[in-house]
Structures are given as C-alpha cells and as structure tokens.
Amino acid sequence: GWSHGDDEIFSMEEMKRYFDPNHISKSCSTFNQTKLEWLNAHYIKNSDDDELVLQLVEFGVDIRSHAKKHLIAQQYKQRAKTLVEMAEGIKILLNRPSCYDEKAYKKFVTESSLSLLAKFADTLSANLNAKECEERTMEFLDANGAKLKDLAQPLRVAITGGSVSPSIFEICEILGSDEVKTRISNLIKKGL
C-alpha cells in the first residue's frame, strides 16, 4: 500500500505531487468498502454541479434541461455515497410514486394526516422557492394547530412514495406547486 502520512483526501494535483513509487510498502494493502464510499461521498459533495449533471446521464438521469438542475444536484449530492445512489434518488423524485413504501405508509398516513395534507394543498401557490414554502408551511401549521412532524413525513410519502428525501421545502421548489398538489391528491385518493 501507499500513504502520505495521515492524509486521506487528495486532489489530482496533490496526488501527482506526493505519489512516489519508492514509498509503496511491501505489506499488502487492504480494501475497505466503507472507506471507499466515504471518500467517494466527499468527492461527490465537492463536485461541480454542472459536472455531476453531465455524469448522471450515464446513470439514466438526464436533468440537463431541467430548470432546477442545480438545486437537484445540490440536494442529492449532499446525501449520496455513489453516483448510482444519487441517480436513484433523483429518479424517485422526478417520477410520481406508483406505489408507497408500506412501512412509511402505515406509520405516517392517517385520517388526520390526509386531512391536513388536503388543507395544505389548497394553500400552495405557484412559483414558491424553498424559503417561501417553509415560511408559508409554518404559518399554515400555526393556523391549524399542527407541528411540522404532523405534515412533513406524510407529505414526503405523498411526494416520493417513502420517508427519505432531501428537505421537503427544497423538494417542493424543485417539483413546483402543481406537481406537489397532484401527488398529494394521488395519496388522498388511495386513502387508508
């Protein structure tokens, strides 16, 4: 194996500068999948958004012409360990759920959450950015005597089909109010 002291993360320029074949040890190197994923996640998080958007095409996700492509890249690169994970998350976001994660559905979808979602959908207006969506959501929750936990997870289930996603407010900005309303309506139609 080879190392440069305790350093683990290098730019290409640093790697070229520091690497010396004379410093390769005779002991066997080991492969550590967890460390590789950690390192890969670091490079994804620090990648240029436009470069990531181009790389995602190879993984079946073409958001090059999406109006919110940079916001999508920014949200998903913070969570992904691999480009495959990033692409899968974006695919889930951009496609309406055809089914819902059973565990998330049972845990978060109730009569009261469906009622709250229906009222919330009526308050959504076009062209909200994430900050405005968050402010309006908090006003809505205050007016209805509810807490964010009462709305966020059921809304996440409606939008993505599951209980894991980036910020719900960022997701609402990416999809737009009409699409969010449609997804809420689809969940309500499914019912309990």
List the predicted regions and their residue ranges.
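Structural motif
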Residues: 26-32, 64-72, 142-150, 163
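A conserved active-site cap/scaffold subdomain adjacent to cofactor or substrate pockets
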Residues: 1-63
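Short, hydrophobic/amphipathic alpha-helical patches that form generic packing surfaces
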Residues: 18, 38-42, 74-81, 153-158
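Small-residue-rich helix-loop
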Residues: 48-144
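Short helix-capping/linker segments at secondary-structure and domain boundaries
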Residues: 1-6, 45-50, 84, 88, ...
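Non-catalytic, well-ordered alpha-helical scaffold segments
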Residues: 13, 33-37, 70, 74, ...
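Charged substrate- and nucleic-acid-binding regions of tRNA-handling and nucleotidyl-transfer enzymes
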Residues: 128-192
